[in-house]
Amino acid sequence: MDYAEMVGRLKKSGEDIIAGWTPLHASRAHMLTGIYDEYMEVTEALILLEGVAVDLGNTVELAKELGDLMFYLIGLAQDYHIEAQVLAYPLPEPSRDALQSMIATTTMVKRHLYYNKPLDTLELAVSIRKFIANVASLAAGTGRTLEDILDLNQEKLLGGRYKEGKFSDEQANDREDETLDT
């Protein structure tokens, strides 16, 4: 058996994945995908700043991506009904390994959604809080607070993309607030 054939046999079918799903499962999968995507965009923004003197002017893109990441983290917390625990202050001290908090969060949710593993929501809340602490630390590195990042994201979404305060596929695809569609 070659590798591609093995993958074809072992990957879980879409039918099996969604067999027991509800709309809430789909929303959680959407948030999970968004977290991964935005984390990669934050990483790209950080790479572009490598070797550059950081100031408020040249960190706008990073700040926007941090806001987008927060959108999906809070959306996931809402889907698991742990928003209040996740947003409680004070946040834990940021760790030196932001990637580890992202991996822990996404792995827990992936296993819950796709492998039907029971999920400990307290453990998830702790993991998301660690993740948010790292977002806050990155925000501080741009001269902004976490609240500044949230305000910037809200301004971007409600002031431009979703002017009516409601999601639509059309508005999600017609991004007037971005010059490059990524």
Outline where the language-model segments fall.
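Flexible "arm" and connector segments at domain edges
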Residues: 1-182
